UniProtKB/Swiss-Prot annotation:
Residues 200-360 are annotated as: Serine protease. It comes from Danio rerio (Zebrafish). Residues 25-109 form the IGFBP N-terminal domain. The lineage of its organism: Eukaryota, Metazoa, Chordata, Craniata, Vertebrata. Residues 94-153 form the Kazal-like domain. The keyword Nucleus does not apply. This is Serine protease HTRA1B. Forms homotrimers. In the presence of substrate, may form higher-order multimers in a PDZ-independent manner. Coiled coil: none annotated. Residues 1-19 form the signal peptide. The record marks Y166, F168, F274 as: Involved in trimer stabilization. It is found in: Secreted; Cytoplasm, Cytosol. Serine protease with a variety of targets, including extracellular matrix proteins and proteoglycans. Through cleavage of proteoglycans, may release soluble FGF-glycosaminoglycan complexes that promote the range and intensity of FGF signals in the extracellular space. Regulates the availability of insulin-like growth factors (IGFs) by cleaving IGF-binding proteins. Inhibits signaling mediated by TGF-beta family members. Consequently, may regulate many physiological processes. Intracellularly, degrades TSC2, leading to the activation of TSC2 downstream targets.
Amino acid sequence: MRLLILCASIILVPLLCDARIIKRYVIGCPERCDKSLCPPIPPDCLAGDILDQCDCCPVCAAGEGESCGGTGKLGDPECGEGLECAVSDGVGATTTVRRRGKTGVCVCKSSEPVCGSDGVSYRNICELKRVSNRAQKLQQPPIIFIQRGACGKGHEENPDSLRHRYNFIADVVEKIAPAVVHIELFRKNVFNREVAVASGSGFVVSEDGLIVTNAHVVANKHRVKVELKTGTTYDAKIKDVDEKADIALIKIDAPMKLPVLLLGRSADLRPGEFVVAIGSPFSLQNTVTTGIVSTTQRGGKELGLRNSDMDYIQTDAIINYGNSGGPLVNLDGEVIGINTLKVTAGISFAIPSDKIRQFLAESHDRQAKGKTATKKKYIGVRMMTLTPTLAKELKQRKNDFPDVTSGAYVIEVIPKTPAEVGGLKESDVIISINGQRITSASDVSTAIKTDESLRAVVRRGNEDIILTIIPEEIDP
C-alpha cells in the first residue's frame, strides 16, 4: 500500500507542476503576487479595471474599439467586462481570440441598444458603461441601465422568453377589455343636481350597443351612464330586467360598431380551470383579477336556494363592489359568467353564461311579441341562503360572525334603496319577517312579493335587531 501511494505521488507531482505552469503561462509573471508593487490605475481609464494576466494587479481594461491580444506577454491589453477580443484577419470579425500571437479589437458582446437613466439611447450596454464611468470621474452621478431598447420605444419581445410564452392572462385581457364597460347610476339630490349613487360593470354583446349587466346594478331605475374603454360616455336605456336571475339588458346608441364578447358554454366548465374577472370595482376601470373555478354551477341544492334560476359558478377570483356585472371569461376570451357577488375572501360567485343565453333568448321573444311585464317589488339587497356548511366556513373567516346556522345571509345592501333606508346592513342574517321564520333567501323574496311592509328580525353579531322595510315597486 505504501509503495502504491509513493508511486501515485511521483506521478502527480509533475502534473501539479504542469498545472502551475499552465496558470502562469504569461511571460513576466512574478513568482508571488505583491499588490503593493502594482502600478496605479490611470485616471483616464473608462473601460473599468480587470486583473492582469497574472491574476495579481488591477489594470485598465481595453475599451470598445481598442486593441487587444498580443504575444502572450505581461502587459498585453485585455478587454473589459462585457467585451470580447475579436480578430479580422481573414477569420471573421466576431471570432474570439483564443491563440497566442493574435491581436484584435474589443467588441461588445451585446449589440442591442439600451436606454440610460439620463434619457439617452446608447448603441449598447458597453457604451453606456463607458459614459457612466466618465461621469463618475467628473464627480457626476452614474448613468443607470434602465431599459433594453432605445429610450421611448418598447423592448422587442423575444418569442422564446418565459414572459412571452406564459403571459396568457395578459393576452386574454387585451382581447376582452375593449368590450367591458363602466356603468354609473345617477339621481338628483335636494338641490336638483345629479350625483352618482352607484356603479358597476357590464359587457357589450351586440355591435349596435346591447350590454349585459346585473339587475341589481341598474334596478333602481336612475339615469344610467355607460363609459367605454375609450373614455366615451353614453346615456343608456334599460331594455329588460330579470330580478330573479339578477340579469339586465341595457342599450346605448353609439355611432360606430362596438367590440363584442361572445358567450361560452358554462356547462362545459371544469373545476380547476383558469378564469379572468374584469370590471370596475370602486370605479377603478378595467381592474383584472384571476383565479380558478372552485365549483361549477353551485346553486339551489348546495346553497339552500329553492329557486333553480340562482345557480352560480364559484371562483376564488376576487369580485368586489363595482365589479358586479362584468364578465368572467375563460382563457379563450369567452364569457362563462357574470361577476355577481363575493361572500368573503376566496369565495365569489358568477351567474353562468348558459343562464345569460337563456335570458337573452327570452328577452328577444318578449320584445318581438311586444310583451310587457308587471311591476316588481324591490328592497335593494343581495343575499343567499345560510346553510350550516356556509355558516361554519364564515365563522372560520370572520370572528364576529353570529351564532346562527340558518336564515338569509345579506351579502350587499345597495345604497339609496328601501333596505338601506330600513337599516339593513351587510353581513346581517335575516331570521324572520312578519313573524314567519326565514330559512332561505327564497323566503325573503316571497315576503317581498306578498307583503306591503316587512317587519324583519336580523341577527347582527350576537344581537337581534327589529327593522321595518317598505318594498318599492319598480319597472322590470
